[in-house]
């Protein structure tokens, strides 16, 4: 407070001669008995005193404002304000001292980039500037001969057995989805397989044994394309040796593993990635029953191929790669075999083996056609049970079921030419399917029906017309 009062007196000095005009003179302060002579408008405070009080209050506000603004910069008035006021020099924090100050008034810039050299902030030199290759100075005290002509190369550590299986399993599973052997070859080149190259066919065949026929066909193509680029024929032979050795364990998860491995061996010999004498080298030296069964299967297939059968047909073409005519024949044979054996689970298994879920409407269509063409009740009942089983197991979806019925509805006029009672049989079969929950009410109502023709002698209601003559 003493500093502030001292600043107020120095900034706004008052005349000592006019002290008598203030609120209290020196005598009144000591004695307190002398009256004030100057009275204006009935007030006991002089006009000059009021003006001085206003000036002092304004100076205080200005000083307090400047002090709070510059408190963060270490140049507050509390530190050096008293010396500046005594010396009569305007402090930098005062308005007069800040006129030539180029710093921001608000403590922030205008948002413009700083000039960090040519080009401004965040710019690497002037536009068009070309950087030369840094040359090593031989006379530099820190010069090292090893710094010249250095070639850097990424070193990939070889995979161990655990990392090998964890890395290659997703690659092969993705290959079963896209079927691009070149992509698999590029990914394997980026890995340092080392001595684990022979493990690639072992892992691929092991995964294919648990998959479908199309997966096994894709695995055979993959082995044929990788041989010579990623692995050699010796690696392929080592891999099949390990497969024959591990057959007892593989047969626990896949009972058909010996026959399937034999087919892989026959296909590999046919593709030229295994030598023709590979099977002969095992004659008389195999004690394992599963390995002997695999070699016998391969021998039979190779002997059949010599008679003219292509080795490419070991697995067949599965999935959507099969022609439509072939699929129609397979479904027709499937239904006829089911009518003879009555084995519903085998029919469902054969349908899944075709791997054509987008073509299941053909089975619905062919099944209903067989019902319309049959003369007994056995086909009617068996086909109804088959469709009901396939529907409950979600083997045939609602879209495929609907499409099969719609095909029958559209072709029933042509079918009726060969089967006169097809309309009545179809109405009965559709009603039974609706009662079993196979089709919806909307699909049932779409079933076409042909009304019975009235004879000329029949009137309305089936009565005979009276004679008009």
From Swiss-Prot:
Key words, A-Z = Acetylation, Apoptosis, Cytoplasm, Nucleus, Phosphoprotein, Repeat, RNA-binding, Tumor suppressor, Ubl conjugation
| CC terms in the record's Gene Ontology section | cytoplasm; cytosol; nucleus
Query: Alphabetically, which GO biological process terms does the record hold?
Result: apoptotic process; BMP signaling pathway; cellular response to lipopolysaccharide; epithelial to mesenchymal transition involved in cardiac fibroblast development; negative regulation of apoptotic process; negative regulation of cytokine production involved in inflammatory response; negative regulation of DNA-templated transcription; negative regulation of JUN kinase activity
Residue positions of the PTM N-acetylmethionine? Answer: 1
Q: Where is this motif: Nuclear localization signal?
A: 58-64, 448-454
Q: Where in this protein does the record say Phosphoserine is found?
A: 25, 67-68, 71, 76, 78, 94, 313, 317, 457
What the entry says about post-translational processing? Polyubiquitinated, leading to its proteasomal degradation. Rapidly degraded in response to mitogens. Phosphorylation of the phosphodegron promotes interaction with BTRC and proteasomal degradation. Phosphorylated at Ser-67 by RPS6KB1 in response to mitogens; phosphorylation promotes proteasomal degradation of PDCD4.
Q: Which sequence ranges form a coiled-coil region, renumbered to this chain?
A: none
Q: Where is this region: Disordered?
A: 1-30, 58-128
Q: What inducers act on this gene?
A: Up-regulated by apoptotic inducers.
Molecular functions per Gene Ontology: RNA binding
Residue ranges annotated as compositionally biased, kind Gly residues, are: 114-125
- Chief location of this protein within or outside the cell: nucleus
What superkingdom does the record give?
A: Eukaryota
- UniProt free text on domains: Binds EIF4A1 via both MI domains.
The family annotation for this protein states: Belongs to the PDCD4 family.
What is the stated purpose of this protein? Answer: Inhibits translation initiation and cap-dependent translation. May excert its function by hindering the interaction between EIF4A1 and EIF4G. Inhibits the helicase activity of EIF4A. Modulates the activation of JUN kinase. Down-regulates the expression of MAP4K1, thus inhibiting events important in driving invasion, namely, MAPK85 activation and consequent JUN-dependent transcription. May play a role in apoptosis. Tumor suppressor. Inhibits tumor promoter-induced neoplastic transformation. Binds RNA.
- Protein name as it appears in the record: Programmed cell death protein 4
User: What species is this protein from?
Assistant: Rattus norvegicus (Rat)
